[in-house]
Amino acid sequence: MSNWLVDKLIPSIMRSEVKKSSVPEGLWHKCPSCEAVLYRPELEKTLDVCPKCNHHMRIGARARLNIFLDVEGREELGADLEPVDRLKFRDGKKYKDRLTAAQKQTGEKDALISMSGTLLGMPVVASAFEFSFMGGSMGAIVGERFVRAANYALENRCPFVCFAASGGARMQEALISLMQMAKTSAVLARLREEGLPFISVLTDPVYGGVSASLAMLGDVIVAEPKALIGFAGPRVIEQTVREKLPEGFQRSEFLLDHGAIDMIVSRSELRPRLGNLLAQMMNLPTPRFVAPVIEPIVVPPAPATI
């Protein structure tokens, strides 16, 4: 028996471990929709959209802005602002501990990044929610960074684009977070009075106080395919009305069919489509869009499991 262990079993285990270690962590990704095993470098070329089923995966705020804005001339707004636990809030865990954990996980100070720059050469300011930071919830810093972006648009007479991905107002900041709904809505009213366009792009998911304020106040409301958009979640609604909801309820396609949003745009088309739209709204020449050259990638055989 001992010879069998030494000669057969142990070498087999060692070969298995070597095989596992030869596949770098994060090199493969499973699509949450069709479960296809995708090569990470190939997925990056498609902007985290599954090439098999067109599922638009969730991406971070910085990745979102990197995709949307021109490379040159970017400047982050409100980067110095940090959240403060003014209420000394505690549920199952202290709020300050939740903040520390979220900051460590994401590398961000809070759940919104605002950045000035250009889109196809046209001055623009953009904000993007970081859903990985406490569900993209809106607190005082998120509201303030949004307002600073809007004020930049007012001062520089340029359009404002926001990419929303949020579970709503941040519970741990109580009334302070609810006040951000009014604060962000008020600054968007100023943009409208000045005739400056605000485009709201709804990504998966957008709920609660964010959907009830800034996310649905765009002059044009755009959504990515299959994004979940609503106020309360489907399960909560079903329990309240005691009825089964229609298929695809709260998906962007359902909202488009019922007139709640204006258009659905794939991630790869956002730059040219919004660039043309903003140029028309600002009475500027149609910008020239040059599609990036995508070099072919040699995809190695996918592992059996990841």
From Swiss-Prot:
Its cofactor is Zn(2+). Zn(2+) binds at C31, C34, C50, C53. Belongs to the AccD/PCCB family. Its EC number is 2.1.3.15. A zinc finger (C4-type) spans 31-53. It catalyses: N(6)-carboxybiotinyl-L-lysyl-[protein] + acetyl-CoA = N(6)-biotinyl-L-lysyl-[protein] + malonyl-CoA. PROSITE patterns: COA_CT_NTER (PS50980). It comes from the Bacteria. Component of the acetyl coenzyme A carboxylase (ACC) complex. Biotin carboxylase (BC) catalyzes the carboxylation of biotin on its carrier protein (BCCP) and then the CO(2) group is transferred by the transcarboxylase to acetyl-CoA to form malonyl-CoA. It is found in: Cytoplasm. It is an enzyme of class 2 (transferase). GO terms for biological process: fatty acid biosynthetic process; malonyl-CoA biosynthetic process. The keyword DNA damage does not apply. Residues 27-296 form the CoA carboxyltransferase N-terminal domain. Binds 1 zinc ion per subunit. GO terms for molecular function: acetyl-CoA carboxylase activity; ATP binding; carboxyl- or carbamoyltransferase activity; zinc ion binding. The keyword Membrane does not apply. Acetyl-CoA carboxylase is a heterohexamer composed of biotin carboxyl carrier protein (AccB), biotin carboxylase (AccC) and two subunits each of ACCase subunit alpha (AccA) and ACCase subunit beta (AccD). Pfam families: Carboxyl_trans (PF01039), Zn_ribbon_ACC (PF17848). Keywords: ATP-binding, Cytoplasm, Fatty acid biosynthesis, Fatty acid metabolism, Lipid biosynthesis, Lipid metabolism, Metal-binding, Nucleotide-binding, Transferase, Zinc, Zinc-finger. This is Acetyl-coenzyme A carboxylase carboxyl transferase subunit beta. Pathway: Lipid metabolism; malonyl-CoA biosynthesis; malonyl-CoA from acetyl-CoA: step 1/1. The lineage of its organism: Bacteria, Pseudomonadati, Pseudomonadota, Gammaproteobacteria, Pseudomonadales.
